Design a protein with these regions (language model features):
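N-terminal leader/linker segments that initiate helical-solenoid repeat arrays
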Residues: 17-75, 83-84, 125, 137, ...
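Terminal, low-structured helical/coil segments at or just beyond the last alpha-helical repeat
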Residues: 27-32, 165-171, 188, 275-277, ...
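"A position-specific structural signal for the A-helix of alpha-solenoid helical repeats
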Residues: 38, 75, 109, 171-175, ...
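Structural motif corresponding to the intra-repeat A-B loop/turn of tetratricopeptide repeats
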Residues: 46, 83, 117, 180, ...
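Short solvent-exposed coil/turn linkers within tandem alpha-helical repeat scaffolds
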Residues: 62-69, 98-105, 135-146, 160-164, ...
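Residue-level recognition of tetratricopeptide repeat
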Residues: 78, 112, 178, 212, ...
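TPR/TPR-like (Sel1-like) alpha-helical repeat modules
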Residues: 112-139, 249, 259-270, 316, ...
Length: 387
């Protein structure tokens, strides 16, 4: 998120603690001007951080009315957030929700606390809470006695005033999901994100990444479910086409579909539009790898079908495109070695296996084993058939 957007979001969070905030969703607590409560709040806002907590305690004790307790809890949340005492912020945030369940700014504050703490579980719990509050507000009918046109205008203005907070929540959620270290949890968070923001480019991208994460978590059924769901909505999603072409070809399943997906990905790689947030060099590298990956899957399909000459053609084309990705390059050369062996071209196979063993990847040891076998075979005289 840009620094400007972060600053705006944080300013809105601070502004939410002012009395009768117009951007607030939930209860509006009116603090009479010049009242004792008003003076106490002014003193809290002006106080040095080291003195704020005692003043907030005094305000909470001297104003037991439930509405004023809402204000007190808001002050506690703000104080503990600034002090980075996140568990205390959560404690008072829950107290605030008990008094004011639709307090949107409190939900945003809880998202902020969870994001800063790195608590992904709470981040998504409160993110879903924030989105639910907004959704309910958007769907709410006009209050009794309110003209529908006036209500539409008021609601639009309020939603516009909350746009930066809404953007902050969305970006905190997607950032938290991508940063989750456990692939199974990362996938689940991305799916939850997609449900909160359906029919958006961010949702589709999140699901594509979720499918890959499910595969990393060795949950192939969920990978297939999510990946096929993405393709049902966007048949040209190159990331998912590559994922499924790779999976099917490697397993020797649905080879015709794998070949179709791989060929489609090759074609799409030449027509994709570069996003604004990526350099020309980075973009060229990405589409080069994508095209090479697709060609490697084509080659693997041919290998599975015992079409070794076609496999050599596709894998050789992929070879030059995958050099910047050690893992994909090594696997491609390993496959190419077998394609050459099937054609009885030992010298070419040896070269391919040597290239596979030359980079640091899981295929190095396997390629070295094949090279040892080929070396032994070359030195061992062929057994003659009995006459």
């Amino acid at each position: 998120m840009s620094s400007t957007r972060i600053l705006t979001a944080l300013l809105l969070l601070s502004a939410s603690l002012a009395p009768a905030c117009k951007a607030q969703l939930g209860k509006n607590v009116m603090i009479p001007a010049g009242s004792d409560a008003d003076h106490q709040l002014n003193a809290i806002n002006a106080a040095d951080p080291s003195q704020k907590l005692a003043l907030i305690d005094t305000f909470a004790k001297s104003n037991p009315d439930p509405d004023f307790q809402i204000v007190a809890d808001e002050q506690y949340v703000n104080y503990y957030l600034n002090a980075k005492q996140y568990e205390k912020a959560f404690e008072y945030g829950e107290k605030l929700f008990a008094l004011d369940p639709n307090n949107y700014v409190n939900a945003v504050n809880m998202v902020r606390a969870a994001a800063e703490k790195g608590d992904h579980t709470k981040l998504f719990t409160y993110g879903e809470k924030a989105n639910s509050i907004l959704a309910n507000y958007k769907a709410a009918p006009p209050p009794e006695g309110t003209n529908p046109d006036d209500w539409s205008r008021i609601r639009t203005e309020k939603l516009v005033s909350l746009r930066d907070d809404e953007d902050y929540v969305e970006e905190a959620l997607i950032g938290g999901a991508y940063n989750a270290k456990d692939p199974a949890k990362r996938a689940d968070y991305l799916v939850r994100f997609s449900k909160m923001y359906p029919n958006t480019p961010e949702s589709e991208q999140a699901l594509a990444v979720a499918a890959t994460a499910y595969l990393q978590a060795q949950n192939r059924p969920k990978m297939l479910e999510v990946a096929n769901g993405v393709l049902a909505k966007d048949p040209d999603n190159i990331d998912v086409l590559l994922l499924l072409a790779d999976d099917y070809s490697e397993r020797g399943e649905q080879l015709d579909k794998a070949d179709t997906y791989a060929k489609k990905a090759v074609s799409l790689a030449d027509t994709l539009k570069k996003p604004d947030n990526i350099s020309d060099e980075e973009w060229q590298k990405k589409i080069t790898i994508q095209k090479g990956w697709a060609l490697s899957s084509e080659g693997q399909v041919s290998l599975q079908k015992k079409q070794s000459a076609q496999a050599v053609d596709s894998l050789s084309k992929a070879s030059t495109l995958l050099r910047s990705n050690a893992g994909l390059y090594a696997r491609n050369q390993y496959r190419l070695g077998f394609a050459y062996l099937n054609l009885k071209k030992t010298a070419e196979a040896t070269k391919a296996f040597t290239e596979a063993a030359s980079v640091d990847s899981p295929y190095r040891a396997m390629a070295e084993d094949k090279l040892s076998e080929l070396g032994t075979a070359a030195k061992t005289p062929a057994h003659k058939k009995p006459s």
